[in-house]
């Protein structure tokens, strides 16, 4: 049940995007501005994620997909990668109780084979604990790359054609979507309505390239650790000033 403040905020904002994707960028620069190591920014980014998740849940957002670690991020310094890989352990230990209380369901997309055992264990434990929740889906894109996702889907489709499980004529956009990592999401909410990128960068960085075909984009110079409730509301207000045409006039 929404509180009076949440209901009032929804009324002012107008239409709430059902699926929001966020490219959480700027942790390192945020730390550098404070003369701190990059890992300090990643830690601060966890607090921002918790606040944004609860806010999105209160507003009635159905899916929040966050770009936590890309397939390209393995090329970063090893000590930073190790710290980032431990963040899910810390995040879930600290925040799963409050997310669970708010009926948030945790899921993920990405290739799990390279994830450290403790990272994967923490993720699976959080998924299992919240699997019966019916509220917002907090969908972590962890070791995720959009091109790799599409390549994998093509391979599976090709194999099914070879195995006579599919005819080439059966291949449609909807069928391809069923082979993507987002196929576990509710059908109506698989594609983001709004994609937000923080830190002033103006690119997708391999984030949901198929699913974002008709997404609205919001780029902000705000660094991720500073992206809290007020910034999310600004992004949604901007989204409401758009007219989504989906290729039509």
Curated annotation (Swiss-Prot):
The keyword Transferase applies. Substrate binds at residues 26-30, 38, 42, 70-72, 74, 76, 197, 203-205. Binds 2 magnesium ions per subunit. Keywords: Magnesium, Metal-binding, Transferase. The active site is at 25, 73 (proton acceptor). Belongs to the UPP synthase family. This is Isoprenyl transferase. The gene is uppS.
């Amino acid at each position: 049940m929404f509180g009076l403040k949440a209901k009032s905020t929804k009324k002012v904002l107008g239409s709430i995007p059902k699926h929001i994707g966020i490219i959480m960028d700027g942790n390192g620069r945020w730390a550098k501005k404070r003369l701190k190591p990059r890992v300090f920014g990643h830690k601060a980014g966890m607090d921002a994620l918790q606040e944004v998740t609860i806010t999105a849940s209160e507003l009635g957002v159905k899916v929040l997909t966050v770009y936590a670690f890309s397939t390209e991020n393995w090329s970063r310094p090893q000590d930073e990668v190790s710290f980032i890989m431990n963040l899910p352990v810390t995040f879930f230990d600290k925040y799963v109780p409050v997310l669970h209380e708010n009926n948030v369901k945790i899921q993920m997309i990405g290739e799990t084979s390279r994830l450290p055992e403790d990272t994967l264990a923490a993720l699976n434990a959080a998924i299992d604990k919240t699997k019966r929740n019916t509220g917002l889906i907090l969908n972590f894109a962890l070791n995720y790359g959009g091109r790799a996702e599409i390549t994998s889907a093509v391979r599976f489709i090709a194999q099914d054609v070879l195995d006579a499980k599919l005819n080439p004529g059966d291949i449609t956009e909807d069928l391809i979507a069923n082979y993507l990592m987002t196929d576990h999401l509710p059908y109506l909410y698989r594609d983001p309505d709004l994609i937000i990128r923080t830190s002033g960068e103006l690119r997708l960085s391999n984030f949901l390239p198929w699913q974002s075909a008709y997404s609205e984009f919001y780029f902000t110079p705000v660094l991720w650790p500073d992206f809290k409730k007020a910034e999310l509301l600004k992004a949604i207000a901007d989204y409401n000033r758009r007219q989504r045409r989906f290729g039509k006039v």
